[in-house]
Curated annotation (Swiss-Prot):
Compositional bias ranges of the Low complexity kind: 167-197
Polar residues bias spans: 15-25, 36-50
Family the UniProt entry places it in: Belongs to the betacoronavirus nucleocapsid protein family.
HAMAP family in UniProt: BETA_CORONA_NCAP
Subcellular location: Virion; Host endoplasmic reticulum-Golgi intermediate compartment; Host Golgi apparatus
GO MF annotation: an example: RNA binding
Protein's name in the database: Nucleoprotein
Amino acid sequence: MATPAPPRAVVFANDNETPTNSQRSGRPRTKPRPAPNTTVSWFTGLTQHGKQPLAFPPGQGVPLNANSTPAQNAGYWRRQDRKINTGNGTKPLAPRWYFYYTGTGPEANLPFRSVKDGIIWVHENGATDAPSVFGTRNPANDPAIVTQFAPGTTLPKNFHIEGTGGNSQSSSRASSRSSSRSSSRNGRSNNSSRNASPAPHGVGDVVGAGTLSVLLDLQKRLADLEAGKGNKQPKVITKKDAQAAKQKMRHKRVATKGYNVVQAFGMRGPGPLQSNFGDMQYNKLGTEDPRWPQIAELAPSASAFMSTSQFKVTHQSNDENGEPVYFLSYSGAIKLDPKNPNYNKWMEILDANIDAYKSFPKKERKQKPSGDDAATAPATSQMEDVPELPPKQQRKKRVVQGSIPQRSAGVPSFEDVVDAIFPDSEA
C-alpha cells in the first residue's frame, strides 16, 4: 500500500508584510536624494566681468523686496569664486556675487559691517543691524527672484544681473520646473525658510500666481519710488548746497566728496582748533570714503560725547565789534576692544589717518610782490639762478622790464643805438 503524501502546509499572509520586489507592481523605488542646499540667496547673482570689485554708494545696493520695510533692507553681498573642470585641468570663471540679509546665509554669524574679504555690506537709509526674518531660499521649492534695484542705483561697470538678457530661457525653464514641483506639493511650506520670505504669499504657492504678484508689487514700488514716496535718490552736492553747508555751525557740518573735509573743517594740523585725523583719501571723500562705516563706529554718540568728555570754555579772540569769541574745548577717550571683529581694521585706519598731514606733499606758494616792488622787479624770482653777464652781452639780449610808463619814460642814447647795430664796434 502506498504511503500517503504529507499534507501541504498552509501559510496565511500578514497584511503588514511588505511585498517582495518580484511581487511589487509599478515603478521601482527611487534612491533618496541628498538634502538641498538651504543657504541659497533669494535673488539672482551679479556676475563680475572685470577687475573692479563690487561697490555701491551709501544707501544703495539692497535688492527690491515687495514685503520688506526700510528698516529690514540691510545685508551683505558675498563673492563666490567659480571654476570649471576641463581636459587640461580647472579653468577659473567670472566670480559671482549673491545678496543675503543680515544674519542669514553662509555668513549668518558675521556681525553687521564686519570686514571680511569677499564681503561688502549694503543698507538703505533707516535700516537696522538686527538679524533679518527673511531667511534663505530652498532651491527645490522656490525659484530665484531676479535682482532689481531702486531707480538711481549705480551698478559698477562690467557687472551683469543674472536672469536678464541672455539668461531668460534658463529662467523660464527654472520657473516651469518650479511650477510643476509646486503643484505636486499642494501648498507645503518651506522648512528651510525662517518666518518669512521675499515672495508676497510665502513659500509653497503656485509659482505662476506668485511671480505675477511679485511683479505687480515691484511695479507699484518702483512707481512709488519714482514719484518720491519711497527712498529718495542720492543727492548731488552742488555749489549752492556747499555754500549753504558753510552757513551751518562748524560742528554740525558733514564732509562729502562735493564738500570735502578741508572745505568743511579746514586744513589738518597741530593747532588747537585743527584736527590731526585724515589722510589724503579721507580728506577728499569725507563720508563717502569706503572706510567710513568702520570710521563711524569710533565716533561717540551725542549722549556719550556729552557724558564722557572733559569740557572747558576758552576765550580765543574778539570779533570785529570787539566782542569776545569763546570756544568749547573737549577731550575724552574711547576704549578699543581687541575682541571686536573690527579691531584690526580700526588700528589700521587709525595708523593711516592720525597725523597723516605730516607726510602730505607741500606745495610751494609763490609770493606776490606788493606795492612799488611789483613794478620794479616783476620777474627776478624766476631769474635768480641765471649768471650775471658782461655789460655788452646784456645789451645784446636786452629784456624790456617794468611797466609801460617806465619803458616809455627814457630815450636810448646814441651809444646804445650804435652798440645795438654794431655790437663788436667801439663807440
